[in-house]
Regions:
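Short beta-strand segments in beta-sandwich/barrel cores
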Residues: 35, 44-45, 62-68, 87
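Short acidic-glycine-tyrosine-enriched beta hairpin
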Residues: 70-92
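His/acidic/aromatic-lined binding-pocket segments of jelly-roll/cupin-type domains
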Residues: 48, 54-59, 80, 88, ...
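Double-stranded beta-helix
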Residues: 5, 11, 72-74, 97-131
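Glycine- and acidic-residue-biased ligand/ion/polar-headgroup-sensing regions
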Residues: 52-71
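Short beta-strand His + acidic residue motifs that chelate non-heme Fe in jelly-roll/DSBH
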Residues: 23, 47, 66-67, 90, ...
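A short, N-terminal "cap"/entry segment at the start of jelly-roll beta-barrel domains
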Residues: 1-33
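Conserved short histidine dyad/triad with adjacent acidic residue
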Residues: 35-53
Length: 131
C-alpha cells in the first residue's frame, strides 16, 4: 500500500546543485499519466473526485486556489493556496476544485491513464465546492 503525503502541500526533497545548474526531484513512483495544463484567469477546474486515481500537481507559474474535502462531507471545503514551485497531492475519494485568479501552468502526474474513456470511468462530478 502506498503511503500518501500527510498534507496537501508536499515537501520537496533537496535539489542536486552544481556548476551546471540544478535538478529538483518532484515525484518518484509508478504512474500512468503526465499532463501539462494551462488555465486562464477566472477558470475553475475539477469539482469532482476520483474513485481510484490520485494525482500530484506542480505549479510552474501562477497560483492555484485549491479546495478539498473527503467525498460525502458536507462541511465547507478546506482552502489551500498553491504557489509557483509548489507540489501538491490529491488522493482518491477527495472532492476537489481548482480556482485560477491568474494565468497558471502546472504539470499533473496521475495513477491512471488520462485516455478520455479511462479518465471518465473513474471521475465523479460533484456540485461546485468552491465558494
Amino acid at each position: 500500500k502506498l503511503l500518501w503525503p500527510k498534507a496537501v502541500i508536499v515537501d520537496l526533497p533537496n535539489s542536486f546543485d552544481d556548476e551546471r545548474g540544478s535538478i529538483q526531484p518532484l515525484v518518484d513512483m509508478k504512474m500512468k499519466s503526465s499532463v501539462l495544463i494551462t488555465s486562464n484567469e477566472g477558470a475553475v477546474r475539477a469539482n469532482h473526485y476520483h474513485k481510484t486515481d490520485w494525482h500530484y500537481c506542480y505549479v510552474l507559474y501562477g497560483e492555484i486556489i485549491y479546495y478539498h474535502r473527503p467525498h460525502g462531507n458536507k462541511e465547507e471545503p478546506k482552502k489551500v493556496i498553491v504557489k509557483e514551485g509548489e507540489l501538491f497531492f490529491t488522493p482518491p475519494m477527495i472532492e476537489h476544485a481548482m480556482v485560477f485568479e491568474k494565468k497558471t501552468k502546472f504539470i499533473t502526474w496521475g495513477r491512471n491513464s488520462r485516455v478520455q474513456e479511462v479518465y471518465e470511468s473513474d471521475v465523479y462530478r460533484v456540485p461546485a465546492i468552491n465558494p
